[in-house]
Every structure is written in structure tokens, then in C-alpha cells.
Amino acid sequence: MVAAPLAVSGLTGCATSGYDHLVTNDRHDIRRVETYLNGLSSLQASFVQDGPAQQQGDGHFTYVPGRFEMVYEVPHAMRAVARDGRFVLRNADNGAVTHLSLKRNPLGLLLRHPVSFDRDVQVTNVSRGTESLQLSVAEADNPSQGLLTLQFSDVRGHLTLVGIQGVDARHHHFGLSLFDVQENQPVSESSFSLPE
């Protein structure tokens, strides 16, 4: 239920970094995603999370470039902060604190700022739907470490982040659906203090 280190099956062998190898429409949409993410000062939303073994949670998600916080209400009170290559979760019920490194975890790709999907990142897929856009990325030099998929609504050319999906090196799936999204609102710096 907690953001397990995200993983991937089926991404092995030599990887091509960046997205120059993709078709023009895909490159255009990737640049749109980069521009959107780099243009955010903040994003706040309610979330519903699916995790390993059908575990679920919900609460509030806050993102600013390079950091995010998740405050869980279900299944019980927990707070998680991702920043500086780390993910720290504190369970308010029992005081337990969990530390995960995001250095080689695809969730860490969301913490890069500015966001750029070239050089050491491999874009593995770009797909479009009715008023939606989805982009999947992995570490170019070691894609078997995991896959991160960002899901956007795409209404009249305006992107909004509405989902984050991932699979980790142990094949654990992580999914976060965002709703009631508010962008570029003031956020307290205390939101990103690491739980102790």
C-alpha cells in the first residue's frame, strides 16, 4: 500500500535514452509534459491509491518540484514525504517509520527538477486517449529497475496530472489516482519536513 519501490518486467537489454528515436507526435507530447511539469509551482489533490496485494489508501497529495507529501486518512493515519532521493513514511498509529531510497527507483524520476525526459531517462511509451495522455519512463541505463507512468487529462490542449502508476524491480505495482486537483496554490514548506 505504501509506495513500494517501483518496478518493471519486460524492460531489459540496451536502452535508448531520451526520445529522439520516437515519432514527431510523441516528441511533441513529451515536450508538452516537460513544459507542464516544469511550469507547476505546486499541485494539490485528493488521492486514491492501489498497491501490492490489493491494499488501498486515500488521503491528500501535495507536489512541488522536487518533492511530494502524501497524508493518508485510510486505512489509518500516515504521512509520507519524498525528497532528496528518499521516501519516508510514518505510521501515526504505532509510530513506525519506513525509509526507502529513490535513487534507483522510478518514483525518483518524479522528483527531478527541472523535469527532462532525455539523457539518462528512457521514454518507453506515449499513448493518447479521448482527452487523455499517458507517458511511461524508466532509467535509461537500467530500465529493469522499474517503470513510471504519468497520466494526464488533456482537455483542449491543457494538461493536468491525474494519475501516477509504477512497477518496481520486484514487480510490485503502485497506482495513485488524483482528483479535485488544484494547481499553483501556496504550499507550506513544513509539508516537506521528513517524518521522524
Language-model-detected regions and their locations in the chain:
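Flexible, processing/modification-adjacent segments and terminal tails
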Residues: 31-52, 90-147
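An acidic-aromatic
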Residues: 58-111, 174
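Gly/Pro-enriched, hydrophobic low-complexity segments
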Residues: 118-119, 128-196
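N-terminal export leaders
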Residues: 1-3, 14
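A mature extracytoplasmic/lumenal domain signature
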Residues: 49, 72-76, 84-86, 93, ...
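Bacterial Sec-type N-terminal signal peptides, specifically the leucine/valine-rich hydrophobic h-region
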Residues: 8-11
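Extracytoplasmic
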Residues: 40-42, 56-58, 65, 75, ...
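N-terminal leader/targeting segments and the immediate start of mature chains
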Residues: 14-56, 64-66, 194-196
